[in-house]
Curated annotation (Swiss-Prot):
<dbReference type="InterPro" id="IPR030689">
    <property type="entry name" value="Cytochrome_b"/>
</dbReference>
<keyword id="KW-0479">Metal-binding</keyword>
<keyword id="KW-0408">Iron</keyword>
<dbReference type="InterPro" id="IPR005798">
    <property type="entry name" value="Cyt_b/b6_C"/>
</dbReference>
<keyword id="KW-1133">Transmembrane helix</keyword>
<dbReference type="GO" id="GO:0045275">
    <property type="term" value="C:respiratory chain complex III"/>
</dbReference>
<feature type="binding site">
    <location>
        <position position="201"/>
    </location>
    <ligand>
        <name>a ubiquinone</name>
    </ligand>
</feature>
<feature type="transmembrane region" description="Helical">
    <location>
        <begin position="33"/>
        <end position="53"/>
    </location>
</feature>
<dbReference type="InterPro" id="IPR005797">
    <property type="entry name" value="Cyt_b/b6_N"/>
</dbReference>
<feature type="binding site" description="axial binding residue">
    <location>
        <position position="182"/>
    </location>
    <ligand>
        <name>heme b b562</name>
    </ligand>
</feature>
<keyword id="KW-0679">Respiratory chain</keyword>
<feature type="transmembrane region" description="Helical">
    <location>
        <begin position="288"/>
        <end position="308"/>
    </location>
</feature>
<dbReference type="GO" id="GO:0008121">
    <property type="term" value="F:ubiquinol-cytochrome-c reductase activity"/>
</dbReference>
<dbReference type="GO" id="GO:0006122">
    <property type="term" value="P:mitochondrial electron transport, ubiquinol to cytochrome c"/>
</dbReference>
<keyword id="KW-0813">Transport</keyword>
<keyword id="KW-0349">Heme</keyword>
<keyword id="KW-0249">Electron transport</keyword>
Length: 379
């Protein structure tokens, strides 16, 4: 008799995706981050749901409702900090997942890569709107500054900003709609993640060597389910340690002050995971130019498959490109640091240099190194 997991309509889908899935036998721990991202999403939706039970999206009570959650709700402090730091671990996994995709040439799975980029944008939008909800100083001014960037769009900019605000400034209408979208977007992200997985299983996973995996595959369970659980333990260790020992390590002290439209904080900055893009935005003196650079810094991922000039999929055997890749990583870390610094010399100059390097490495240096390596293969 055939096992029900292979015949039952629902169990069959789960079986083909997580149990009997043919998986390359040589994939490393860099392939763990997909399942870790799924776990992060589940943690965020669960903790977010409990927070939404006690939160009020009104400018007069939002700040005090967050204080009420932290002080009066049973384990409210833990739920809140798990949610806040869960976002940080989510983005750490996200950046590592994208980095692995770039290094091992996973972007050649075009549909999977395109959906993944949309997932990144949706996650960034969700995180931004979530940051506005506690209605602290940085929430209010962050929302004001970032939404105001849309006013740089010719002709329709000002109308668009007022349409998003629901008035002439960031106020009750803005907070209510941000809460609405922040609540619904994670479920859209979950649906997109399912599509992402669907496209991935059409082609199968890549592997570190960059060669075809067809001749040598093993079932996902028990081999990789056990491996994923190990990664999950590390993730939970980091998240729980962060939540219990230093929950405010990654947050801004200004956000513990109630939003005040009459008092601007000395340094307006987003959460750490947006700092690289914020640094690129600030490095261009022109407003519209800055907004375009900000958009391009993320959307450039969409054109990466067209910039792939190498005859090899992976960077595993391409030493010149490897140097450029790790230079790009260092450049992104530099941009993240610069984004948190004041707009003054020498930070401005470093930020502008790092921004130019970011686009230069991706658009010209990596494709150029690929062409050089192709030539070297012939010698």
């Amino acid at each position: 008799m055939t096992s029900p997991r292979k015949t039952h309509p629902l169990a069959k889908i789960i079986n083909q995706s997580f149990i009997d899935l043919p998986t390359p036998s040589n994939i490393s721990s860099w392939w763990n981050f997909g399942s870790l991202l799924g776990t992060c999403l589940i943690i965020q939706i669960t903790t977010g749901l409990f927070l939404a039970m006690h939160y009020t999206s009104d400018t007069t009570t939002a700040f005090s409702s967050v204080a009420h959650i932290t002080r009066d709700v049973n384990y409210g402090w833990m739920i809140r900090y798990l949610h806040a730091n869960g976002a940080s671990t989510f983005f750490i996994c996200l950046f590592l997942h994208i980095g692995r995709g770039l290094y091992y040439g996973s972007f050649l799975f075009l549909k999977t890569w395109a959906v993944g980029t949309i997932l990144l944008l949706a996650t960034m939008a969700t995180a931004f709107m979530g940051y506005v909800l506690p209605w602290g100083q940085m929430s209010f001014w962050g929302a004001t500054v970032i939404t105001n960037l849309l006013s740089a769009i010719p002709y329709v900019g000002s109308d668009l900003v007022q349409w998003i605000w629901g008035g002439f400034s960031v106020d009750k209408a803005t907070l209510t709609r941000f809460f609405t979208f922040h609540f619904i977007l994670p479920f859209i992200i979950a649906a997109l993640a399912t599509i992402h997985l669907l496209f991935l299983h059409e082609t199968g996973s890549s592997n570190p060597s960059g060669m075809t995996s067809e001749p040598d595959k093993i079932p996902f369970h028990p081999y990789y389910s056990i491996k994923d659980i190990l990664g999950l333990m590390f993730l939970l260790l980091v998240l729980i340690s962060l939540t219990l020992f230093s929950p405010d390590l990654l947050t801004d002290p200004d956000n513990y002050t109630l939003a005040n439209p009459l008092n601007t904080p000395p340094h307006i900055k987003p959460e750490w995971y947006f700092l690289f893009a914020y640094a690129i935005l600030r490095s261009i003196p022109n407003k519209l130019g800055g907004v375009l650079a900000l958009m391009l810094s993320i959307l450039i991922l969409m054109i990466i498959p067209t910039l792939h000039m190498s005859k090899q999929q992976s960077m595993a055997f391409r030493p010149i490109t490897q140097i450029l890749f790790w230079t790009l990583v260092a450049d992104l870390l530099t941009l993240t640091w610069i984004g948190g610094q004041p707009v003054e010399y020498p930070y401005m100059t470093v930020g502008q240099t790092a921004s130019i390097m970011y686009f230069l490495i991706i658009i010209s240096l990596i494709p150029l190194s690929a062409l050089i390596e192709n030539k070297l293969l012939k010698w």
